[in-house]
Amino acid sequence: MSITPSKLANQLLRFFCAPHRLEEVQGDLHEEFTYQVQRMGERRARWRYWWDVLGFIKPFAIKRKSTDQYSNPAITDMLRTYFKIAFRNLSQNKGYSTLTIFGLALGLAVSLFSILYVADEFSYDRFNEKADRIYRINSDISFSLKGLKAATSPTPMGETLKRDFPEVEEATRLGKYGSHLVKSDQIVIREQGVLYADSTVFSVFTLSVLAGNPTKALAEPQSVVITESISKKYFGTTDALNRVLVFDDNDVRHVTAVIKDIPAQSHVQADFLLPLHETKDAKAAKWGNHIFTTYLLLKPGTNPQAVEAKFEKILQTYVDPALRRYFNTSLAETRKAGNYFNYSLIPLTKIHLYSDREGELSPNNSIQYVYLFLIIGLFILLIAVFNFINLTTARSAKRAREVGVRKVAGSTRAELVFQFLSESLLTTFFALLAGVGLVYFLLPAFNTLAAKKLVFDQVIDVSSVLYLLAGTGFVGLLAGLYPALYLSSFKPITALAGKVWVMPGRQSLRSYLVIFQFSLSVLLIIGTLLINQQMRYIQTKKLGFDKEQVVIINTAQSTEQDVTTFKREVLRSPAIKTGTVSGFLPVTSNRWNDMWYPEEETDQKLSVGMQEWQVDPDYVATLGMQLLKGRNFTAGRIADNQTVIINESAAKQFGYQHPVGKTIHKTGGEQLTIIGVVKDFHYESLRNTIEPVGLVLDATALGGNAGHSFDNVSFRFQTADVSTALASIERTWKQIALGRPFTYSFLSEEFDAMYRAEQRIEQLFMVFASVAILIACLGLFGLSAFAAEQRQKEIGVRKVLGASVTGIVTLLSKDFLKPVLIAIVIASPVAWWAMTKWLQGFAYKVDMDWWVFAVAGFLSIGIALLTISVQSIKAALVNPVKSLRSE
């Protein structure tokens, strides 16, 4: 039995001695006590021990705080170390780092473009200070059981509502009459951005006035308000008050105000504002004229639904008498026949994304396309995030021993999770820098592709930077959380043994993520192929007219003599085959239908809504239309002034099997005799069905002097040498037009312009599909590389046993092809459903053939095989001696 010192002495020592010195002091005293017991006996040794204990109660040993005491640091104390380790790991694994950072950078760049685009779309018209109280009046009208959704409303409606409805604070109207020839002392230009506006426009919309009095600017006679850029363009300065501009040769106007350029994020775009009250339509003030768009500024706190509820009173009080006066019918009879007249309000801030009506002041976007853009951007970011997760977990075997050593050294799981999250955040931060760089360099190309005017300053302002950092942090946590939890879960013994590899063939999370990535890629490929197929169908479909080799010369506001002489002189050129003067072309229909009745009928149920186009006798021949029955107009034949050529749709709706010689009449008494029927031709987008159209002669085509409504002269070339033909036309124009600018376009280009939105969608889909496939393939490339590295000893053994290179490549590839095949199976029905919905917007469309899905599938498999094979072949060609030398 060992002899021990006095317990009381030990307690006294523990009480006085500093904890960080106790072990050392007590150990020394116990050794000394054992020695003294042997030397002088137990009794004397105990007294000596007490003496030594009392002797150690000195200032150096008495209880006090340690100056070098080490305590377990908090997780946040290790941040610097974690980021340093993360940076070293990224530097040591340059291939892995490049794949993950580049993939994330692409995903972040696409998502940034998506956010910029969506934010820009939702910002439309919000710069107006009273935007939340401004509403536009929409019209829903049906005649002949054909509905018309218009952005315009009756000419007197705004003024009437302001007078009769106390909820309306102010009203203003805007109107557009096409292009105008504008001339100053220095230049003459045909301008498209001319709007007519009431003087109250400044009270409703936020227009920053640089010079002039906004309350009087449009109230003065022969006035014009111009923008800052127009002022510099025509006068070289913004000091343009009282300067003179001449519109259409003889309309002299004085500048009464200069305003700042209207922001691009406005559905109302104008360079010139002219007084609307001076127009003939405004002076006529007819309730049957839907020429202008009307905007209401409601009083604060007004419920727009309450205003809409009062529109029935407007219909009964004003519209019903107009119907009786001009159409010999009543509102009740119109509704009884199945037709309708309705008015509604749409908030100003919703017009750009939620309105697609006749008479829109500018082309609007669709909220469906905006959401689609946002969703695709999000999906591509998810593909990049899943890449990071896959590549990080695939490297688990390499990090396993590191995890094991850290756990043995005392690291907790929370500390390991924090370390791996730090690495993820650092990777994401580098990816953000690269992504922002991509946005900077690619923004001009994106603006061209998306028809936008986005600026890089929107990315780097303070609020955007904060959102970017917060978003990047979220993406970093999202991407790094699962790998961090997965890697930190390894048991030290298993981790140090390196037995943590999961084979790719197992249905692990990595397989599901690959399936998700390629499902989105296949979906985008199928969408791109089908959109491309529909666009090719539009370009190659027989339209009922020949759009090639036809040039359009804008002659609006030209005199009758000028137009007639110009056409006659141009036709002398051997480069020109034929020409026509017209107000309407198959790409610029008015879409406004008049009510026409067969023979002597007056019943609204038998009426036909038909457009009336004024043309000359050469119209049908110049546009290459096919005359199915009857004859064409004859130049100089006065009787043809009371005739009409209709299309097949009109003949069908009138119920005429043999329409030639039949008569039709319009409400009000105008009667025309049908002399011919042309084959149906498309005059609108293929989204719409072909409706009735009637071609009638203008008075000037017969040598009359009633004035003309012609805006264009179109010529068909005799030669393929377009430049020679255009030069000939331009020479003649300069001789006759007396200084007016020569502006032209091609009929084929005007036709293509109707599908610009679809063309942009096609291009965006192609870009998105390419980016999605690239990111997915980066991940697949990394996974196949890690798989080949982990199985190098297995490959070596197989080669020693006689396996061929082809067999090994097949072995390594098949496990990765399974998720791709599953992705094709999942994506195909989803793509079929989505594209069916999209194609429903077209009245004339392609069938979704099976080969489109087959091509998308084979393309995906081919790309995946090509990506995997690079690493598989490389691994299969390695000398087995190198892979087995450590065994």
Language model: regions and residue ranges:
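Small-residue-rich transmembrane alpha-helices
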Residues: 113, 344, 425-492, 533, ...
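Negatively charged linear elements and acidic catalytic determinants
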Residues: 1-91, 881-885
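Hydrophobic, regular-secondary-structure patches
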Residues: 121, 135-193, 200, 232-237, ...
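Mid-to-C-terminal secondary-structure elements
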Residues: 198-210, 224-365, 565-757
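Hydrophobic alpha-helical transmembrane segments of multi-pass inner-membrane transport and secretion
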Residues: 76, 92-117, 365-401, 429, ...
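Alpha-helical transmembrane segments of integral membrane proteins
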Residues: 66-98, 359-362, 392-429, 440-560, ...
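Interfacial "coupling" helices/loops that link adjacent transmembrane helices in transporter permeases
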Residues: 384-426, 779-817, 871-874, 878-879
